[in-house]
């Protein structure tokens, strides 16, 4: 059985005045990973480095983004592989604090940052999942809470406008989805 993470997370680590922000994302495909990378590079334009690694299905990639070769991307990739995860992108954004860490220090810092991010992410078995979309009226929080608290639903994303739009991945035979289909409100579950 393959493991993946259930939700996107981030953690901050400071070492010798350098700030390392570790992000972990669930990614269905490489295109999704590239979109996250583009988003983070735009968000952290003043960062010294945006290093990453991913394992997505049979695809693996690691980038040191200007750090000495093998000191950033590979340690991140090793953390993903050690935990036997798939469909995961880890990005570590570094803001240089003025003190050089040396090659060994960089390996430890990037590895620790990746570990911190993954430690805060719950894991789940990766099954053949179906993507669902759900639009809720404000006030239907019980439905929202049942989704948030369900261990078999992952990659939960929210968008707030006149309704609460939710997309997520789940096994289409999941019991909580059957209860969503019979709610008497205007909740509509759509298979994407």
Enumerate the language-model features and the residues they cover:
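C-terminal regulatory domains involved in ligand/effector binding and gene-expression control
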Residues: 1-71, 157, 182-192
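Glycine- and acidic-rich phosphate- and metal-coordinating loops
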Residues: 54-55, 86-96
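Short Cys/His-based metal-binding microdomains
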Residues: 101
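Long, charge-dense
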Residues: 106, 110-129
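Short glycine-/aliphatic-rich beta-strand segments at the starts of folded cytosolic domains
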Residues: 123-138, 166-167
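Short amphipathic alpha-helix segments
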Residues: 134-153, 177
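N-terminal positively charged helical leader segments and presequences
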Residues: 161-164
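Terminal, non-globular segments
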Residues: 168-177
